Regions:
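...captures the hydrophobic TM-helix bundle architecture rather than a specific catalytic motif
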Residues: 1-213
Length: 213
């Protein structure tokens, strides 16, 4: 935990320097340290669970509490971005020309890629739920198939979002609209990428027979 915390500090400081002076090595160093620390930490968790038997019922309860607190923190994180969006969209001020969206912003058609990505997310939620229930029922084939489909859908969502960003007519610095759009959807896309990686690891571990009901 101390090493990972230090890596996060290096990453944050490096990101600030990159924003102000285009010096990027500190940010990439912090990111590399964080990835390495997370890999080693997760590896220890797997070893403790699968080979040493340290995940007693009490430890499992602690894991559930930790996940609950993590999800609560994620909810509050995104509440902040939704709050910023609704505050400026429902009460537009002189800074945005008293209209929303700002008149010089060409927005995406909500019935195009955004709708497709929403359906992809809903479908991925269905497939991962199928995988979970298959595991609980001892159906390892359904468990693996559900995870494979979920990982594919996660990668497809990321590809569509990258395509959407590439064809956007506004930038991060174009009014508060661009800032809120890219921060909210960017962090959401980042969560999808991380979740896809986690599920890919679960798929690999599932093929090794690590999970039981």
């Amino acid at each position: 935990p101390i090493y990972v915390s230090f890596s996060c500090l290096v990453l944050a400081i490096g990101a600030v320097y990159y924003m102000h002076s285009d010096v990027s090595w500190g940010m990439y160093l912090g990111l590399a340290l964080l990835i390495y620390g997370a890999y080693m930490w997760f590896r220890d968790v797997v070893i403790e669970a699968e080979h040493q038997g340290h995940h007693t019922p009490v430890v499992q309860i602690h894991h559930r509490y930790g996940m609950t607190l993590f999800i609560a923190s994620e909810v509050m994180f995104f509440v902040a971005w939704f709050w910023a969006y609704f505050d400026v969209s429902l009460f537009p001020n002189d800074f945005v020309g008293n209209v929303w969206p700002p008149k010089d912003i060409v927005t995406f058609d909500p019935w195009d890629i955004p709708l497709i990505n929403t359906l992809v997310l809903l479908l991925s939620g269905t497939t991962v739920t199928w995988s979970h229930h298959s595991l609980l029922e001892g159906d390892r084939k359904g468990f693996i198939q559900g995870l494979v489909l979920t990982v594919i859908l996660g990668a497809f969502f990321t590809a569509l979002q990258a395509y959407e960003y590439h064809h956007a007519t506004f930038a991060f610095s174009d009014h508060i609209y661009g800032s809120v759009f890219y921060m909210a959807t960017g962090f959401h896309g980042f969560h999808v990428i991380v979740g896809t990686i986690f599920l890919a690891v679960c798929l690999w571990r599932g093929k090794l027979g690590h999970f039981t009901k």
